[in-house]
Amino acid sequence: MSYTKDDIHNLVLKQREFFLTGITLDVNFRIQQLKRLKEMMLNNSARIEKALYDDLGRSDAEAYFCDIGSVVMEINEYIKGVKKWNKPENHGSGLACFPSTKTKVYKLPYGVSLIISPFNFPFLLSVGVLAASIAGGNTALIKASSKSKASTEVLKQLIADTFPPEYCVVIDGGHDIADFCLEERVDKIFYTGSPNVGKHVMEMASKNLTPVTLELGGETGNWAIVRKDANLKDAARKIAFFKIMNAGQVCININQVAVASEVADQFIEELKTAYIKQIGENPLENDEYPKLIAQRAYDNIEKEAEEYRDRIVFGGKGNKETWKYAPTVIYPVNIDEPIVNHEIFGPLLPVVRFEDAEINQLMDVIARREHGLALYVFTKDKKWAKKVMSTQQYGGGCINEVCLHLMVKGVPFNGTGHSGMGAYHGIWGFREFTHPSSVLFGHTHFNLPLREHPYNKKKKKLLGAFLK
């Protein structure tokens, strides 16, 4: 379907009218919708897996793990927690507000939310965000990616079969349709994608002063640091697994590895072994190995690989017909080269060497670049690891592990700086789609004349006693 500007405007009007009925304020209504959303995902897993294979070449197992099971876990958390989270907070008003003794903080929905989702996890990053919006009591327009055509079509059909359009609807189309949505006066915008488009979203949102959440990849990518005392086999195995996932098209994926020079060659050999063990000698013929999303994405990866052809120590092959490009290790790479100064979003893995004794200099270089969405460190030195993870600027990460911080219940998923703003998952998602409203309960039969005109020295003295 091709949308006009009027079509989008009318959808927003209908959703606002639905919101103003007050139906979504009922927490039991929200829980019912979340349960319907969960059933939608579970009852249509085969259709979802097929769409993800068509778009991204994902295996059934990877599709279920990344875009179905993880979404269901997220929805379960909202179903279980939303009643508790939505309860008003009780606060004492304090002596300065006497005779009032009671103040409540209500958690109120914004209204009409706009969710703009990317191609790489078309269900996780649309339905997962939708669950947060529903839990918060909003209506939702989902602008799904035009790149993941099969997934967007399935998502559009499933949402249409599950919810009325005045409550939740999926809109497909390109950047022009996204701009139609952004021009509308919605009440909350949640965007997942690149920093450049994130800036455009913020600029458009500023015209209506619409609050925005941005989940971005970060302009200089996510680092993995491998110290000389790390378990190299374990680190290589986990890094290879993660780079294979979705052919590297993951916002929290490892963009580049910095490995201690003392163990760099050994680490490279372990990395090669891990890749071969997991996806074989020829991943281009392995049906479990995903593909890139489009010809343009393939061409960009192929072009960048060719620029570093003389330093490719593993991989470096692709298939233009299937858009598959093998996991490719580029080594050694200087920390100032272009490939480690932008987000690759693909299966290329540049490896930088550093002297382990000069780890602080490395971390200083990383700290001066744009903040990544994730950071991963591999070391036996837990004290150092904790210090780094508690002082660097990044979204989230792991010590001696990859990506699993995303699966932990009750903790936020977020970026900082050029990797985003705002947080979601569980209670953090509920908070992101609600705003607090503080209400003081006054008295009608007893007032304090102290605050009223005319003022005198006695009143000022008493005010001083109250307000200190």
Q: Where do the model's predicted regions map?
A:
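Short gly/ser/thr-rich secondary-structure transition/capping motifs
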Residues: H91-P99, V170-G173, K238-I239, R311-V313, ...
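ALDH superfamily catalytic-core signature
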Residues: S2, F163, N196-I335, D356-N360, ...
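Residue-level signal for inorganic ion chemistry
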Residues: R30, I75, G137, C168, ...
